[in-house]
Amino acid sequence: MTNSIRIGTRKSPLALIHTNLVIQQIKQFFPDINCKIVPIITSGDLIQNKPLYDIGGKALFLKEIEQALLDKKIDLAVHSLKDVPGRIPEPLVIAAVLEREDPRDVFVCLKYKSIEELPQNAVIGSSAVRRKAFIQKIRPDLKVTVFRGNVDSRIKKLMTGEVDATILAYTGLKRLEAFNPEYCHLIEYSQMLPCIGQGVIAVEIRKDDNAMLKICNQINHLPTFELIKPERAFLEYLDANCRTPIAAYSQYLDADPRHLSKLAYRKAFEGNTEALATAAYKSDRTDASTGLTYKLPLEVEFGKMSNIQTDFMLGNLDGSKITFHTETTNIKTSTEAGIKAAKMMLEAICK
């Protein structure tokens, strides 16, 4: 096992918080490993005055980091999964995710509590075509203007009156301790589906790096890993970019297994690693989509808490036509469900 890990990440405050959360998980299982953060400035960080769809999409937040991985300048990379395109470079793989946080969006406004309450022709700052499509579906009269930057800068722009409101991810606000209930109001899934992968921290490695794979195998939150498969399959099949209004949100129907993790079992067995391995895990399972092998928890292997419902949204390029679809599936066929939804909805949009 390696003694040191170089972890690549963006330099933003939120990205560094995400990276430290990954390090905390690594330290739970490998307390003696030295974790070195390697901050990397990406093209997406440098270009702030244009919408992402005009400059290459969300991949601009990954390009330099993934290149550092390929060049072996770092050992693993930490991303917000919502920024990761459906297709990544062939030698790389998303090998682990942390437990998903609440993926809802937040309506941020000083005077009003919802999009519906805004006055006629009010201005909302947002560069996401997904959010723009939902906003215009709810209130066609509203003007949506380009609004980029980190969480703090967007809130400052709101405070100075550049826009009447903006929409941000709850997870980012929470982790930055910037969620203020006086002007931050959660938007329910029924009104605005989250971005694919929203609320999930992802760890990317080289496929052939067995040392990093062993680490990822330990820190990977399997219930979340399974949950995002239909969302990611939907995104990958459509090869969607920042010009396409697209959203998906998956949830377990039978129960909420988000706390089904090795750490939880470790606590339950009071640190008895041998008992943990024997009682909590049934068998190895190779993931067809990544080629990686993980130990599968008994509850999931036995079919408990394994039915997934995914709500999908897809719009045409100008957002004038939006279609919705819901798939319910077992974890064994969740990837196929995402592909099925993509095919059906693409056909509906193209009619």
Curated annotation (Swiss-Prot):
**GO terms assigned for molecular function:** hydroxymethylbilane synthase activity
The annotation note on the cofactor reads: Binds 1 dipyrromethane group covalently.
- The record's top EC class is transferase
Q: In which pathway does it act?
A: Porphyrin-containing compound metabolism; protoporphyrin-IX biosynthesis; coproporphyrinogen-III from 5-aminolevulinate: step 2/4
**CDD domains listed in its UniProt record:** PBP2_PBGD_2
Source domain of life is Bacteria
Q: Which residues carry this modification: S-(dipyrrolylmethanemethyl)cysteine?
A: C242
Q: Which cofactor does it need?
A: dipyrromethane
Q: Which UniProt keywords apply?
A: Porphyrin biosynthesis, Transferase
**Reaction catalysed by this enzyme:** 4 porphobilinogen + H2O = hydroxymethylbilane + 4 NH4(+)
Task: Give the matching PANTHER family.
Answer: PORPHOBILINOGEN DEAMINASE
| Subunit relationships | Monomer.
Miscellaneous note, as given in the UniProt record, is: The porphobilinogen subunits are added to the dipyrromethane group.
Q: Which family does the record assign?
A: Belongs to the HMBS family.
Protein name, please?
Porphobilinogen deaminase
Q: What is the lineage of its organism?
A: Bacteria, Pseudomonadati, Pseudomonadota, Alphaproteobacteria, Rickettsiales
